[in-house]
Amino acid sequence: VYFVNAFAANDPSSTARIYEKINNISFLRTQCFVLLVNNRPDRAYRVEQLSMIIRDMKYDEIWLVGSYKKLMRNKLISKGVKKEAIKIHERINARDFAEIERDTTIFAIGNVAGKGNEIIDIVERIGELLVQ
């Protein structure tokens, strides 16, 4: 499992650029690609911004955490995302990562605050750094 932390990319164009870069890294082209999206409570406007770029991405699943999960789910569905691809998580823990198929890339976007920091703490505890 590869985890790409783009939580700190504070605007949609930076997130899109990082997405394009990781698509050009061969070992990150895995069988399963998960978008992990974290929203913070004071950034409701990011739901629309992120949904616009997500609709153009290729993914197998979208995991929603943090604030505005249902709003984000509805916005994504209205933009053509299949609702079966969207998973709402109240929290992510080490067991969630342990249950992931090995040939998976998780691309974490949105905001680092709140749930994002919790997820980073888990990844740092159970993972190893390949690229900085």
Please annotate each region the language model reported.
Residues 1-132:
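ATP-dependent carboxylate-amine ligase
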